Amino acid sequence: MASHLASIYGTEQDKVNCSFYYKIGACRHGERCSRKHVKPNFSQTILCPNMYKNPIHEPNGKKFTQRELAEQFDAFYEDMFCEFSKYGEVEQLVVCDNVGDHLVGNVYVRFKYEESAQNAIDDLNSRWYSQRPVYAELSPVTDFREACCRQHETSECQRGGLCNFMHAKKPSPQLLRDLVLAQRKYLALNAAEEMKKEPNSDSTNRWVSVTAERKN
């Protein structure tokens, strides 16, 4: 019985726990959902809900060219990536372009380590971004391939922005490459600096002991 429950946990067969919350980290029913939304105590992934404001959804009526929209999003994505990377190595950053209340503007960040995610949560909830308070929570999402709408990837989604799966908004490929490379170099530099600060104590002890033996 226990193994069966474990095998269906978070799936559509699970009548107790919400499969959408488990896969997406958000559910259109919110607190009114008939199934449980089990918030994780530990996770590599954090969610900052409603953080991205797409200019085309703003009520000011201003029109933008596609180039302007792309440049604005690249600036936002770079800002997010650089800031989140201060807490630890970022493996994936996903920004939702959905318009449904539970997904609109959601920013998901998966770190390499759970400790980095927790550090981010502890700090971000006392900060502001673009004149608005930041809200951050641990998310159960670990596999964005399951969370993202596959039809949207091929421009075939019939539900548009109201889809209940993530419509991930992509930065320019060059920007993403630059950010990943910059993070890799930064981590390598930090690792090299740490090695300089902390000499291998075991190696030092071995040399001392050998020297002592020779003297004897």
From Swiss-Prot:
Keyword rRNA-binding attributed: no
Keywords assigned: Metal-binding, mRNA processing, mRNA splicing, Nucleus, Repeat, RNA-binding, Zinc, Zinc-finger
PROSITE patterns: RRM, ZF_C3H1
Transport in keyword set: no
Gene3D superfamilies assigned to the protein according to its UniProt record, in alphabetical order: 3.30.70.330
Example of a GO cellular component annotation carried by this entry: spliceosomal complex
Subcellular location: Nucleus
Region described as Disordered: spans on this chain: 194-216
Main location: nucleus
GO biological process, one term: mRNA splicing, via spliceosome
GO molecular function, one term: zinc ion binding
Start and end residues, zinc fingers (C3H1-type): 12-40, 143-170
SUPFAM superfamilies cross-referenced by the UniProt entry: RNA-binding domain, RBD
Domain RRM: 44-141
Quaternary structure (record): Forms a heterodimer with the U2AF large subunit. Can also form a homodimer. U2AF large subunit (U2AF59), U2AF small subunit (U2AF23) and SF1 (bpb1) interact to form a complex required for complex A formation. Interacts with cwf13.
Function recorded in the entry: Necessary for the splicing of pre-mRNA. The SF1-U2AF59-U2AF23 complex has a role in the recognition of the branch site (5'-UACUAAC-3'), the pyrimidine tract and the 3'-splice site at the 3'-end of introns.
Protein name: Splicing factor U2AF 23 kDa subunit
